[in-house]
A protein has these predicted regions:
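A charged N-terminal "starter" segment
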Residues: 1-102, 108, 116, 124
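Active-site loop/helix belt of alpha/beta enzymes
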Residues: 4-5, 39-56, 116-118, 123-126, ...
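Proline- and acidic/polar-enriched loop/turn elements at helix boundaries
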Residues: 66, 85, 108, 130, ...
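Glycine-rich anion/phosphate-binding loops
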Residues: 102-112, 142-148
Length: 220
């Protein structure tokens, strides 16, 4: 009888650390990095990677896809900010506020519910506004009407509009024009918010390709 083993991958954290250093060396001075560890760190182990880079001063925090992934990191002792890039269902808002998770906000109704939950718990919920500049997933449209909505969101009690972000759809292509157009739209929307007195602490949009090839997109 033959015995078979399941396929597995052995991850060398020294190699992962080297990759982080390579990314850092391409960052614009003063720009921090978000460690994206969704889907279990793309199969490399979200928890051990997050624990390894927690002490890196250039790591602002982490990004995941779901509330479950965020809670896994929190319960493993991760203290830095955790941003959920995808949709968060209302039944998870209590945990979002309780465990200080950053949700991506792209609807006024969502922001209102998060604000109400934060008031109920006596805490502040820090949100990152998602603007769609060309990826065509989730996000506010980059227009004046959306800017007015974000202004309303910024005035909700116990809610901090901490960040504004978008996602490049084609930054890894040789032709950088589509990504440059997205960056231009993002910056224009950011100015619309500034004109309305909306205070955003963190502006971010670069993915890996953006870090390497679009220095002008290395923001906060």
């Amino acid at each position: 009888m033959k015995h078979y083993m399941r396929v597995c991958a052995e991850i060398n954290l020294d190699a992962v650390a080297y990759n982080f250093k390579s990314m850092k060396d391409n960052l614009t001075p003063g720009t921090k990095m978000v460690a994206v560890v969704k889907t279990d760190g793309y199969g490399h182990g979200a928890v051990p990677i997050a624990q390894m880079v927690e002490a890196y001063d250039y790591i602002w925090g982490y990004a995941v896809a779901t509330i479950e992934e965020a809670l896994l990191l929190r319960k493993a002792g991760i203290k830095k900010p955790i941003l959920i890039l995808g949709f968060v269902f209302p039944d998870a808002y209590e945990e979002v506020v309780k465990y200080d998770i950053r949700p991506a906000v792209f609807k006024l109704s969502m922001a209102r519910q998060l604000s109400e939950e934060a008031v109920r718990q006596g805490k502040t919920v820090h949100v990152h506004i998602k603007v769609d500049t060309g990826m065509s997933r989730i996000g506010f449209k980059d227009n004046a009407e959306s800017a007015d909505i974000v202004k309303e969101i910024s005035h909700l009690p116990n809610l901090d509009t901490e960040g504004l972000f978008t996602h490049f759809a084609r930054a890894d292509e040789t032709d950088k024009t589509p990504a440059e157009v997205q960056l231009s739209r993002y910056l224009a929307f950011s100015r619309l918010l500034e004109d309305r007195g909306v205070n955003i602490t963190l502006h971010h949009c670069s993915n890996s390709a953006g870090i390497f090839d679009l220095k002008q997109a290395n923001l906060d």
